[in-house]
Swiss-Prot record:
Domain of life: Bacteria
UniProt name for this protein: tRNA/tmRNA (uracil-C(5))-methyltransferase
Enzyme class, broadest EC rank: transferase
Active-site residues, Swiss-Prot/TrEMBL: C326 (nucleophile), E360 (proton acceptor)
Organism: Actinobacillus pleuropneumoniae serotype 3 (strain JL03)
Family, per entry: Belongs to the class I-like SAM-binding methyltransferase superfamily. RNA M5U methyltransferase family. TrmA subfamily.
Amino acid sequence: MNLPIEQYADLLAEKAKNLTALLAPFNPPELEVFESETSHFRMRAEFRVWHDTNEVGENELYHIMFDQETKQRYRVDQFPIANHLINKMMSSLLAEIKGNELLTRKLFQVDYLSTLSGEIAVSMLYHKKLNEEWQAEAAALKARLEHQGFKVQILGRATKQKIALDRDYVEEVLPVDGRNLIYRQVENSFTQPNAKMNIKMLEWARSCTRHSSGDLLELYCGNGNFSIALAENFRKVLATEISKSSVQSAQYNIEQNGIDNLQIIRMSAEEFTQAMNGVREFNRLKGIDLKAYDCNTIFVDPPRAGLDQDTLNMVQAYERILYISCNPHTLADNLQQLTQTHRIERAALFDQFPYTHHVESGVWLIRK
């Protein structure tokens, strides 16, 4: 698989041109553009596993992907989009499990999650129930990979079954504005795929909010990626997240980073809107006095569908809005309403996904 590295600058310029045109009706300042590394930038990858027989009758297996247009499978021995650690593990893993019936039989997928800190989780997915014999073989595999120098976690997954030999997460350390931030990242839950671009996003968000007063509300906080980085810019931070594993990771990350002004609530943005408007009461909010927060800044990083109408109405009530978007078209839709009351102070493009049409962007809005 070859990347069109020589075309990267032109591809990024085209994205910037398109985003600038999309935002033009809202009179933004000049777009800030943050470029990615041109290869080995992705921290996670997943591959199907193909089983074959070579010319001398030996069983072979290799990673495959599918062409998005033709749907034809193709073999992947190296994956230049993924970071060097994943590429190294791809070849080491297959070499170690080759010929091992317990580890390879009905293995259909392998997922990799890596970090800049040098840790990697390998999740092996099976169409069979995993037993103690599998665990023993997987433990031996883990030991062999560790002997090669890998800081590795091995996980096995099958229908209604998940086995973590040691733990089901890796720990990332991100240098943000001169400070190392620790993030627990759980296998099979959302993490930012381009870690170095994530650092640029965090630093940009911090620079937008540097001289803020009052408190911050964040919706969809995940493992605390943004709220932890932003906490020192505010008196207090209140954040919501619906995923149980993400909330647990966020609580751990808050503790590890010594953050004492950040509270996470497990509820959806829609539920929180109802609570703020007094429409419903929630047991999950017992012990949390929402009136004690003076949240005049809100941070949103919604799904591709953008903000729903009720949340959009709620967001509009805040003095300052920091909006990170993974879909510029729904961002533009939301801005039609938000710019009735707010102006765009800053706008940015973060090339989280080079060589694709996907665009990550951010806008910093201030009440008019």
